[in-house]
Amino acid sequence: MRQNNNITEFVLLGFSQDPGVQKALFVMFLLTYLVTVVGNLLIVVDIIASPSLGSPMYFFLACLSFIDAAYSTTISPKLIVGLFCDKKTISFQGCMGQLFIDHFFGGAEVFLLVVMACDRYVAICKPLHYLTIMNRQVCFLLLVVAMIGGFVHSAFQIVVYSLPFCGPNVIVHFSCDMHPLLELACTDTYFIGLTVVVNSGAICMVIFNLLLISYGVILSSLKTYSQEKRGKALSTCSSGSTVVVLFFVPCIFIYVRPVSNFPTDKFMTVFYTIITHMLSPLIYTLRNSEMRNAIEKLLGKKLTIFIIGGVSVLM
């Protein structure tokens, strides 16, 4: 239960108070959000609609794309509305909800990236047993484990709810997150800050290193492969490792340190909450011929149906 709390809403300071800069940022973040949602949902629909994309790798990619779209939706709409309407306030309950959902999808993505690395290891290092090991039941179980991991990680954020907030209520950020909220609490948050480092920073650091090692092991096993298979495996691994670096490096910068609010934090947060999720569909499709062909077929069918429907209406 919250005690000594007279704060009912927070003010998200955002990036700039200059109207011209806000308009430019509004256009930029709106376009980025639209590209993110359309790109990720296109991958989800494409994988569901294409029988050729029925392997476990594409199942996990569809799940990752859905999480990316949901993750971005947790942050971007509020940011965009604030820039357009100059409404920068968020209720206390809304702030806590954003914090929880943000970390839920972020935690789920971290564990899902681990699952995807394991999937690639089995596919490349044990190809004859791949479909036996990564059967449908195992895939769903791994997905559930990733989601539970995200929930457990986000459940820790509830500790902020019980902290007293007496004022000021200005968050020097564009969204609700642990570090800026802990700085506003009217109590000593040193030990809570240390648990944030463990719950977010240390986990990101450990998993990031494990993922890099796993991709290194996979790459070292490609020596015995033919040039064609080696090229395909390298393409898949390079896509996965690129997303891992783009997502984890900013997270580590933010969370592997005591509670403090650096000017660069907002821009680093934009990178791993918005930019990475926009780039993810491009990274996974540009070097994957199967994905490109499936998307071309899907868009070709939709375009044909649209043209036929339009002609029918005109006739």
UniProtKB/Swiss-Prot annotation:
Cytoplasmic face: residue ranges? 48-55, 119-137, 217-232, 287-315
Q: What is its main location?
A: membrane
- The residues exposed to the Extracellular compartment are 1-23, 78-98, 157-192, 256-266
Q: Where are the transmembrane segments?
A: 24-47, 56-77, 99-118, 138-156, 193-216, 233-255, 267-286
Q: Does the keyword ATP-binding apply?
A: no
Q: Which UniProt keywords apply?
A: Cell membrane, Disulfide bond, G-protein coupled receptor, Glycoprotein, Membrane, Olfaction, Receptor, Sensory transduction, Transducer, Transmembrane, Transmembrane helix
Annotated GO MF terms: G protein-coupled receptor activity; olfactory receptor activity
**Membrane topology, as annotated:** Multi-pass membrane protein
The cysteines joined by S-S bonds are: 95-186
Glycosylation sites (chain numbering):
6
Q: Which Gene3D superfamilies does the UniProt entry name for this protein?
A: Rhodopsin 7-helix transmembrane proteins (1.20.1070.10)
Keyword Metal-binding listed? The answer is no
**Location(s), subcellular:** Cell membrane
What CDD domains does the entry give? 7tmA_OR4A-like
Gene Ontology CC terms, in alphabetical order: plasma membrane
Protein family per UniProt:
Belongs to the G-protein coupled receptor 1 family.
Name the UniProt record assigns to this protein: Olfactory receptor 4A5
